[in-house]
Amino acid sequence: MKDKWPTLRICAGLFFGASLVAAQAEETVLERVVVEANRLPDPESAAPFSTHVVDAEELRRAPQLRLDDILRAQVPGFSLFRRSSSRTANPTTQGVTLRNFGPSGAGRTLVLLDGIPLNDPFAGYVLWSQVPPASIDSVLVSPGGGAGLFGNAALAGTIFLVSKPLNATSASVEGSIGNDDTYEASLEATIVQRPVAAAVFAEWFSTGGYPVIAPDQRGPVDEHATSDSNLVDLHAEWQISDNTSLRLQGRRFEDDRGNGTALTQNSTTGHDISAVLTHKFPAQRGELQVSAYGQGRRFRSTFSSVNAARTVETPALDQFNVPADAAGGSAVWSMIASEHRIVLGGDARWMEGKTNERFLWNGTTFRRLREAGGAQVFAGLFAEDTWSLSSNTTIVGGFRFDHWELFDGFRKETERATGSILTNSRFADRTGDELNGRLGLRVKPTDALALRGAVYTGFRVPTLNELYRPFRVGNDITEANAALKPEHLLGGEVAVEWQASQTFRLSGTGFLNRLEDAVSNVTIGVGPGTFNPGGFIPAGGVLRQRRNVDLVVAPGFEATSEWQLIPALSLRGGYLFTHPTIERAAEPALRGKLLAQTPEHVFTGGVEWKPTAQWLVSAQVRYSDRQFEDDQNSRVLAPFTTVDVALRYDFSARGSAAIRVENLLDTEIETGKSADGLISIGPPRQVSLQVRWQL
């Protein structure tokens, strides 16, 4: 048996080693040097890579309740696997992608909260209910860039979530009530008694939801998709000395959902702990940051089969226990040397998980039991130099080396009544080494104009979920594939940024990505019939398996603009064009097809009007082009346009009230279409009243 705790050992060594260094370091402050070793991109610097920023005030003004909905409305390249909001969507469909680069349940984007990964250790998705907007100070979205400083999970980009700083003693409460029995309440309290500060954030959310099947197709078995969640986040900071600080954080959350019928539910519980030690070296104009974390997840999900008339529902799959755990850490050194900002470091992450599920319903009980899972380890070293050749020219160059391992992979199936073993597969351990890099240039020929370009490579090893766990949506089944190979990216982009004045900004970015061995859900059978793998597929159902597609080429163009017409009125717009096409595949029918779940055109726009100091009116519009539901491009999801609005009144310096309306026009959004034509839909009009008070 392979050592299952390598990352914990690495993290412990890094953390306590850095603690010793910090304790022995000189504490005399020579000068204040603002250098951060957390790998967070500086949006104000002359970086050659794309960055979108959503600050605390923009989060507060947004008409949307959920963070993913806010980002979807403000960043045209942000999307989840499906069009549904995370408010009621199944967690396994909440994988994040940027620039529509191969949406999947696992996602190809790394999401970090204060430098700690939020991606599920087993499946790669992000459960967005664990990061309510009220707990976040800012969001930085960095599409593209390849492996960059972060490696495996950052193939399509990185999203940085930053918690509110512990600056002063304060407390606030926030609550909202809306249609469809939707309620939300949160409490935030911070105590600052230097050199120590501590904070607690607690949030509770509940919605009665809405029916997820198109109105003319619903039957007696259909009911509302519901959601209930809660979160408690505790963190503390200790300023050990003028140059040394320690941050501790612990989080626990629960999420329970009904998926639209009586027999389909899922639940998630999770807990995270982390520690971050930071020490500044003023004489060297440098900073060392060491972090360590542990994560645990427990997931359960049930699936059913429904007859054509939607009058009878039958249990189909019970994933009754899906545990997953992760541990990791990093050590990052950053320093300024003349015209160079240098970042050096290493990180590691260990993940283990398995699925325990009952399947093959015989009319009374599930006949069979399946167990499947495994473990992964990633360890990487990276270096990057940002070189300011002049006030107008910046070059960024870096590389990253990663070592990865897959081990203890297995799949076992037994007859529950007799205990007889039907399948007992042990998958070969695998290892690999990856070397990636990126190079970027930014030039300002004039004060108003900036030009930038970048090339980069990246990779992604399939998640444990993709390798070992099947899933079901209605009568459609997707099988796992333990033989999946890692994906590899070669990408590049060029951009023009024009700031005509302090009140007008326009940027455009053209990009081209080549993804080899892209993991995709490939159709291998149509029901009714019995298939291997997959078993029996009912009429109207489709069997897919996760497989590597040889080559996907994804050209695209992204544009953003901001215009402050007058101090009280501002406009914002964004546009994304993408055309991700399968160029080579083992299955001839896939060649020339667009990737599923990728609209070619997405437009976002917003307007804010502040007629007085107390009143704020905001409106946002989003258009998404048609997209294909399946890999065969045979099922089309219709285009849609949504409008969200908000009216806020600040009745004092401490308090405000807001009316928010999402999907003002009550647009029917097609989120899924099965082989037999059954259409799933997104949320209808959502109206809520929110009150916030600073105590």
Segment roles from a protein language model:
Residues 225, 233, 320-333, 370, ...:
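Outer membrane beta-barrel strand-and-loop segments of large Gram-negative receptors
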Residues 241, 293, 339-343, 347, ...:
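Structural signature of Gram-negative outer-membrane beta-barrels, strongest in the C-terminal barrel
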Residues 254, 298-300, 352-361, 405-419, ...:
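Surface-exposed extracellular loop regions of Gram-negative outer-membrane beta-barrel proteins
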Residues 147-148, 160, 167-176, 188-268:
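Periplasmic-side early beta-strands and strand-to-turn transitions of outer-membrane beta-barrels
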Residues 116-143, 224:
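Short acidic/polar hinge/loop motifs at secondary-structure boundaries
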Residues 207-213, 223-229, 243-288, 296-324, ...:
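Flexible loop and strand-edge segments within Gram-negative outer membrane beta-barrel domains
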